[in-house]
């Protein structure tokens, strides 16, 4: 049985699983779908064409599915899609997409979104991501699986943050952070490989060693980016556990539009 507080407003048309819990004074819009066992905190607003999966916990005063902060937006029925088992803490804001991009903002599974985080229009957040309190994502930002974004950080529009990367607190990021790399500062600069995070996630010693070698080629040996990429491709043919992550690193760099931090 759905547990909806008598002061909450669920507009006609909303599709709410019978196991969902909705707290006092929450507002659920007519185009919202909420999956099983999700809880919505008091005073939260879930609006727009928003789909929320199962087992999510949304804290009080969150604003989910709001209009994009984009002056080109003209009330198009763009979307927000949220996966399963996410924690979205109080006062977080997540906006729908725009037609200038794919028209959808996405948040995957098992993410930990702390208080006052902003996820702008057309962002694509993967799985197992941690966004610390007051981290601010501008529009069109992409964040790979297992990335960690420190509190009070700002990420420029269209920036990409690779899988297993880490951005330190109070950083200003204006270019892409390659996978596995730690970045910090204003403006953010590279500070090594996220070794501890990789160990916790089961990366082998050989894979971590290969990524450390890749980091030296990219940042420590005085090579141009093209020279470094050539040597990285050679490193990725070594035949060990490091081949796949080094290849992922090269593919990320090749796809960069804003350039990587250097």
Swiss-Prot record:
Transmembrane segments: none
CDD domains referenced in this protein's UniProt entry, alphabetically: LbH_UDP-GlcNAc_AT
One annotated Gene Ontology cellular component of this protein: membrane
Single biological process term from Gene Ontology: lipid A biosynthetic process
Entries under PROSITE patterns matching the protein: HEXAPEP_TRANSFERASES
Localization annotation: Cytoplasm
Major localisation: cytoplasm
Function: Involved in the biosynthesis of lipid A, a phosphorylated glycolipid that anchors the lipopolysaccharide to the outer membrane of the cell.
Assembly information from the UniProt record: Homotrimer.
Name by which UniProt lists this protein: Acyl-[acyl-carrier-protein]--UDP-N-acetylglucosamine O-acyltransferase
Originating species: Burkholderia multivorans (strain ATCC 17616 / 249)
């Amino acid at each position: 049985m759905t547990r909806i507080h008598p002061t909450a407003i669920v507009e006609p048309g909303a599709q709410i699983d019978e196991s969902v819990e909705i707290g006092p004074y929450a507002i659920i819009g007519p185009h919202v779908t909420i999956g099983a066992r999700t809880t919505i905190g008091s005073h939260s607003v879930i609006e727009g064409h928003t789909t929320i999966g199962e087992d999510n916990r949304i804290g009080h005063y969150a604003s989910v599915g709001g209009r994009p902060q984009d002056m080109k937006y003209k009330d198009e029925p763009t979307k927000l899609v949220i996966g399963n088992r996410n924690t979205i803490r109080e006062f977080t804001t997540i906006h729908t997409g725009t037609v200038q991009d794919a028209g959808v903002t996405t948040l995957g599974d098992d993410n930990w979104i702390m208080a006052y985080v902003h996820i702008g229009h057309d962002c694509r957040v993967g799985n197992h991501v941690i966004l610390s309190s007051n981290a601010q994502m501008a529009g069109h930002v992409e964040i790979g699986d297992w990335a960690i974004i420190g509190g009070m950080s700002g990420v420029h529009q269209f920036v990409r943050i690779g899988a297993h990367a880490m951005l330190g607190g109070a950083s200003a990021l204006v270019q892409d952070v390659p996978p596995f790399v730690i970045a910090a500062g204003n403006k953010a600069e590279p500070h090594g490989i996220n070794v501890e995070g990789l160990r916790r996630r089961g990366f082998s010693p050989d894979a971590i060693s290969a990524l450390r070698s890749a980091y030296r080629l990219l940042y420590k040996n005085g090579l141009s980016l093209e020279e470094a990429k050539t040597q990285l491709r050679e490193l990725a043919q070594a035949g060990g556990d490091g081949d796949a992550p080094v290849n992922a690193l090269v593919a990320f760099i090749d796809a960069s539009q804003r350039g990587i931090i250097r």
